[in-house]
């Protein structure tokens, strides 16, 4: 069956809801504070990502649709950082600034892949005059094909019923990702998208699919909804509409790595697809495919048109894995258009061991995409001697490409990947070992382009050389 993606470029979607900024501080921990029994984290990496309703808008923009975002912020650095991050990925922001409140910010401190603490900077926006939000919605209704209301119970949607009525009068579908158990406030919405836990918190525990349908249809009638989509994790999702046969879609996820933000992806793809002129059933089909992609990524993520197309055509591996240099350049260009941060590293990776896997996982966390450049067999032989490599290039690249942390694998013939790096110009160049940043091949080119260069430590006790020596000793023994 030939599947054609929706014409996302002609879709206009407004997202209104609770916007927030997610901050991440990363660093090693090697001692306990003398002031209190707590670890000391030496912060070496800081990341800022749009969260809440802002992540929904990013998901819409990543598809190539026209995304507008309305929400409440303070007048502070967090609001400015949020606006800049969203502008970089083509989300049009029209925030209402509230000088008496801070922008909702969640700061997470992480070390050795563990979150040590989360600090929330927020004051609920309940009681803030909703009229400026209503005015922004009214101004946009003639130019959008869908309105998303993203509720995190922080106060931006205190007047959600008025917002629903504004859109209904204009004939614009309203999609809501609900929060809490008071679904009365969402009366008259086009579509609610609760997950199974949220759904059962309202209707009670459902032991069978039939119970989900029965109670879901009653919910639709009670609150005058047009449809209900219950997302059910590994069991897929169920679309319920009055007078129509329930549509149960199995999950398309090959491997679940992280469900963070999956709900944002689902409602974002639903809205963009509906706004492009497709049916609700088609929108659910694409949203289900997108969810299968995004849960295979670490952290809050978005889905690109290429990834979505590959997923719906059953070719989730196309566009990723082992690539030629020219294919890689095209993939990187597409990633940059989506506002993704590209990380690059290189090495021989002859006998893949735990140290390699840990190193690559840590490198991947520093960005959105990870490129691994691999020395060819001839290059490896010149660097390591006639007995190397143990594993030929093709096998080394296939194994690397199968790792969850690795997006793209490419080879190079030279002793160093300097020429390759100069052609790719990653946002962040990473190398493991005892190098100084200025000693790393390609560092000058990356710096000249405004990028960063970082040295990561390898896991102690892990090396290909030691593994080979042990094998040789075991043979002699």
UniProtKB/Swiss-Prot annotation:
Q: Name one Pfam family in it.
A: CTP_transf_like
Active site (record annotation): 264
Q: One MF term in GO for this entry?
A: ATP binding
UniProt xrefs under InterPro entries: Bifunc_HldE, Carboh/pur_kinase_PfkB_CS, Cyt_trans-like, PfkB_dom, RfaE_dom_I, RfaE_dom_II, Ribokinase-like, Rossmann-like_a/b/a_fold
Class of this enzyme: transferase
Pathway field of the UniProt record reads:
Nucleotide-sugar biosynthesis; ADP-L-glycero-beta-D-manno-heptose biosynthesis; ADP-L-glycero-beta-D-manno-heptose from D-glycero-beta-D-manno-heptose 7-phosphate: step 1/4; Nucleotide-sugar biosynthesis; ADP-L-glycero-beta-D-manno-heptose biosynthesis; ADP-L-glycero-beta-D-manno-heptose from D-glycero-beta-D-manno-heptose 7-phosphate: step 3/4
- Region described as Ribokinase: 1-318
A single GO BP term for this record reads: ADP-L-glycero-beta-D-manno-heptose biosynthetic process
Which parts of this chain are annotated as the region Cytidylyltransferase? 344-477
Q: Where does the source fall among the domains of life? A: Bacteria
GO terms for cellular component? cytosol
Q: Which residues carry this modification: N6-acetyllysine?
A: 179
Name the Enzyme Commission number(s) assigned to this protein: 2.7.1.167, 2.7.7.70
Q: Which Gene3D superfamilies does the UniProt entry name for this protein? A: 3.40.1190.20, HUPs
The record lists the catalysed reaction(s) as: D-glycero-beta-D-manno-heptose 7-phosphate + ATP = D-glycero-beta-D-manno-heptose 1,7-bisphosphate + ADP + H(+); D-glycero-beta-D-manno-heptose 1-phosphate + ATP + H(+) = ADP-D-glycero-beta-D-manno-heptose + diphosphate
Q: Which UniProt keywords apply?
A: Acetylation, ATP-binding, Carbohydrate metabolism, Kinase, Multifunctional enzyme, Nucleotide-binding, Nucleotidyltransferase, Transferase
Protein residues bound to ATP: 195-198
Complex and partners: Homodimer.
Q: What is the role of this chain? A: Catalyzes the ADP transfer from ATP to D-glycero-beta-D-manno-heptose 1-phosphate, yielding ADP-D-glycero-beta-D-manno-heptose.
Q: Into which family does the record put it?
A: In the N-terminal section; belongs to the carbohydrate kinase PfkB family.
Alphabetical list of PANTHER family matching this protein: BIFUNCTIONAL PROTEIN HLDE
Task: Identify this protein by name.
Answer: Bifunctional protein HldE
Instruction: Name the lineage.
Output: Bacteria, Pseudomonadati, Pseudomonadota, Gammaproteobacteria, Enterobacterales
Q: Which gene encodes it?
A: hldE
